[in-house]
Design a protein with these regions (language model features):
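Short alpha-helix
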Residues: 234-253
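A conserved beta-strand element that flanks and buttresses the S-adenosyl-L-methionine
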Residues: 170
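A short glycine-rich, Lys/Arg-flanked "PGG" loop and its adjoining helix->strand segment in the class I
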Residues: 182-197
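Core SAM-dependent methyltransferase catalytic element
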Residues: 254, 268-300
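Conserved class I S-adenosyl-L-methionine
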Residues: 31-97, 115, 199-223
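Short catalytic micro-motifs in class I SAM-dependent methyltransferases
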Residues: 173-177
Length: 305
């Protein structure tokens, strides 16, 4: 994988040359194995949120030594029991997909990126979080153990990749952090090859926006009480409705499947109790979105890269 065949300058949005700097002056830098493809302005803008996010993650016990995921977690066992099922569903979906470049958007420590590499993809972990606790730098453990993947610092709304180069784009418990869902999905469509797929995994969906708004309002109160967190930061993690998803997909001329995943006995019981109380809890389906081939083009069904 070479920079001239894949990367886009985050500053001028032109193909990034092999020999830096870019003609606009942007200089590609790598630190602790992470390729920085975010502008200084973007980095400064997101830093306050990252500091607040890290505080919550540490308090809730995420990251650190909990890396052998999703099947051997040390903490949050109930959450990971659900994610094991969504992971298996995701694995079955990509089994017959032509291999090529795969992005793990919002990759965190790269535990899913490691699996993409094992399955034969040219895998890239993408995240704005480079923390050694649960961000991109934490992925060094997998690389030391033999995994092969790149780590790129970037936001999901301005991906630093050339158009139509990505075979698979997975958002792993991360799409709900997008500041604008439609802009992010439009970027995903731009970089995807015809016939490639987008998989939205472990993001909360609701039938009705009122239930999602209730969840967010409760989080705002909790995070203000526990961390003194501003409302804008507490609302960075959002939700989707099935109607909004359908409208976004249609507007971008994509096709979509929503595949339900059984959440387990406990959460099923919680869903029943919530309905009796006149509300609904979040669902976590696997959403598969496909980019169509252009009229008259030849479908490539090979399994080569």
């Amino acid at each position: 994988m070479s920079a001239d065949s894949l990367f886009l300058c985050p500053q001028c949005r032109q193909p990034l040359p092999v020999r830096p700097p870019c003609s606009c002056g942007f200089l590609l830098r790598e630190s602790n194995g992470v390729i920085n493809l975010i502008t200084d302005e973007e980095s400064a803008a997101v830093q306050p949120f990252l500091e607040a996010y890290e505080q919550v993650r540490q308090d809730e016990g995420w990251g650190g030594d909990d890396l052998d995921l999703p099947f051997h977690p040390r903490r949050h066992l109930e959450i990971w029991s659900i994610r094991q099922r969504t992971f298996r569903k995701f694995e079955s979906i990509v089994a017959d997909l032509s291999r090529g470049t795969a992005l793990d958007i919002g990759a965190g420590n790269g535990w899913m990126t490691r699996h993409l590499d094992r399955w034969g993809f040219d895998a890239i972990a993408v995240d704005i979080n480079t923390s050694p606790m649960d961000g991109l730098r934490a992925g060094q453990k997998f690389i030391d153990e033999g995994a092969s993947f790149l780590r790129v610092r970037s936001g999901m709304e301005r991906l630093p990749f050339l158009s139509e180069r990505i075979r698979l784009l997975a958002t792993n418990a991360s799409f709900h952090y997008a500041s604008d869902f439609r802009i992010a999905l439009s970027e995903f469509e731009r970089v995807l090859t015809p016939g490639g797929i987008i998989a939205i995994v472990d993001s909360p969906f609701y039938e009705n926006a009122a239930d999602g708004e209730r969840m967010m309002a409760e989080r705002v109160v909790e995070f203000r009480r526990k961390y003194g967190m501003p409302e804008t930061f507490a609302r960075r993690s959002r939700y989707l409705t099935y109607k909004d998803l359908e409208e976004m997909v249609r507007s971008l001329n994509l096709s979509c499947q929503v595949l339900p995943v059984w959440p387990g006995f406990r959460r099923s019981y919680e869903a029943i109790r919530a309905k009796f109380a006149g509300r609904n809890i979040a669902e976590f389906p696997v959403v598969v979105i496909e980019k169509h081939f252009a009229m008259g083009s030849n479908r490539d069904t090979s399994h080569g890269s």
